Amino acid sequence: MRRKRLSEEDFVAQKTAEHPCFDCGAGKRNARIHLPVAPKCNIQCNYCVRKYDCVNESRPGVTSVVLSPAEAVDRFKKARKAIPDLTVAGIAGPGDALASFEEGAETLNRIRSIDPDITFCLSTNGLMLPFYVNHIISLGVTHVTVTVNSVDPTVGAKIYHHVTYLGKEHTGEEGASLLLQNQLSGIRYLSSMGVVVKVNIVLIKGINDHEIDEIVYMVKDCGCKITNIMQLIPVKGSAFESMKLISQSQMNQIRKECENILPQMYHCRQCRADAMGTLEHDLKHDIV
């Protein structure tokens, strides 16, 4: 008996149900692999220090090595053999996926040729989304995560040291405003084309904690399906290394309040750029 072909909407819904970073149930049963092929970044967040040869820290922006597209495909093949529940291949750094887009696109194209069913996702700060949305869609990427930390340029100016756009460095409110404009237009277009968008929000006590609900409202209006409000990681060497944190109970209360606007993610592990396995059990050191 011929299997009924899924509608595009049902197809994406099925992939979402198998994506550990978009579905809580999938976080327990499905595995993902992050392929660290994107070393460049076009903004400098005051909470970020990227590391390309680190084996100890567990946070975004960190990888033990940056891979070429060919090396990334080899790693994917090994992971696919070793992890039966591998359903997602993503590009999440260690820089920004769209600042090193050629490497990411080549990687995903090669993987698609050997695995037509794998779900593709990528994470980005959103600065270059208006330039690459059609390319992202043509690659078969169904899930995109955009980090939006402020919808007020006066606040964004405190979070971003600078934004480098089309070869020019922008600072202060100018840079924050440019970034926000591109983030929102990119989210709006991706959502209109059926791509599932999740927005990550790094909550920074005393800086953007007063506008979290406003961020959630605004990205909802652009078509975002879920938001992930995350605790700041005070990285040594960053401008925010001494920043105080809110309590976990306060964090969960903010998430609970924002659930009235959009579904919230509670199970994020703030993974490395080379994470592999389920959210509970990283298998990179067992496979690589």
For the regions a protein language model found, what residue spans apply to each?
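N-terminal [4Fe-4S]-dependent radical SAM core
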Residues: 1-36, 41, 50-66, 78, ...
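Short glycine-enriched, charge-decorated loop/helix-capping segments at active-site entrances
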Residues: 59-64, 160-163, 172-173, 241-245
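Active-site mouth loops of central-metabolism enzymes
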Residues: 61-69, 204-209
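Short Fe-S-cluster ligation motifs
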Residues: 71-92
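Short glycine-centered, acidic/aromatic-flanked micro-motifs in structured strand/loop junctions
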Residues: 91-94, 201-203, 255
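Conserved AdoMet/S-adenosylmethionine-binding subsite of the radical SAM
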Residues: 97-230
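Flexible glycine/acidic-rich beta-alpha junction loops that bind and position SAM and/or redox cofactors
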Residues: 154-161, 206-209, 226-246, 271-283
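C-terminal accessory region of radical SAM enzymes
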Residues: 194, 245-280
